[in-house]
Amino acid sequence: MQARDPHVNVIFVGLMGAGKTTVGRAVARRLDRPFFDSDHEIEARTGARIPVIFELEGEAGFRDREAQMIAELTQRENIVLATGGGAILRPENRKLLHERGLVVYLRANPHDLWLRTRKDKNRPLLQTDDPKAKLEALYEARDPLYRECAHFVIETGRPSVNGLVNMVLMQLEMAGIVAKPLQA
């Protein structure tokens, strides 16, 4: 795929379980760009899993690390970045994301997110008595913030990963980021 503006980063935002890492990795592969996941980068740098960081430093400590990682990663050019679900909580992160890349909000309804994440013990915010209710509350609080920093929204629904990747590539083509989408 030919890039019209090879310097524009493609950044994925959305709630946990929306598919940011899976879709982002596939988009990066199709665009022949490096892929980064901010949560994975934090884990690699600290040598600790996200739940351990939450336990030791609290959510505020983790969000500090996340803001630093986002600032660092978005200084690069020509990358595809998947952010953590709460990356948009801080106004400075929303501003950086919006200014330093083309932001794709992968929107999924809370029920689908619950089905995808219900058995995952590596999601500290869902370690509650009612994780489905927690996802609904997170969606209500965060949806406006995702929309604020997004350049466009992709409704994930139930299409395949390849279907979502093609939708993203079509949006990138319409935004002038790539010349034309390639089929997988």
Swiss-Prot record:
Gene Ontology cellular-component terms listed: cytosol
Catalysed reactions, as listed in the record: shikimate + ATP = 3-phosphoshikimate + ADP + H(+)
Cofactor annotation comment: Binds 1 Mg(2+) ion per subunit.
Binding site for substrate: 39, 63, 85, 142
InterPro entries: P-loop_NTPase, Shikimate/glucono_kinase, Shikimate_kinase/TSH1, Shikimate_kinase_CS
An example molecular function term from Gene Ontology annotations: magnesium ion binding
Record: residues binding ATP: 17-22, 123
Subcellular location per the Swiss-Prot or TrEMBL entry: Cytoplasm
Main subcellular localisation: cytoplasm
EC nos: 2.7.1.71
Pathways involved: Metabolic intermediate biosynthesis; chorismate biosynthesis; chorismate from D-erythrose 4-phosphate and phosphoenolpyruvate: step 5/7
Keyword set, alphabetical order: Amino-acid biosynthesis, Aromatic amino acid biosynthesis, ATP-binding, Cytoplasm, Kinase, Magnesium, Metal-binding, Nucleotide-binding, Transferase
Listed cofactors: Mg(2+)
A GO biological process held by the record: amino acid biosynthetic process
Pfam family of the protein (one): SKI
Top EC class for this record: transferase
CDD domains: SK
UniProt-listed PANTHER family: SHIKIMATE KINASE, SHIKIMATE KINASE 1, CHLOROPLASTIC
Function: Catalyzes the specific phosphorylation of the 3-hydroxyl group of shikimic acid using ATP as a cosubstrate.
Oligomer status and interactors: Monomer.
Annotated family: Belongs to the shikimate kinase family.
The name this protein goes by in its record: Shikimate kinase
Species, as recorded: Burkholderia mallei (strain ATCC 23344)
Gene: aroK
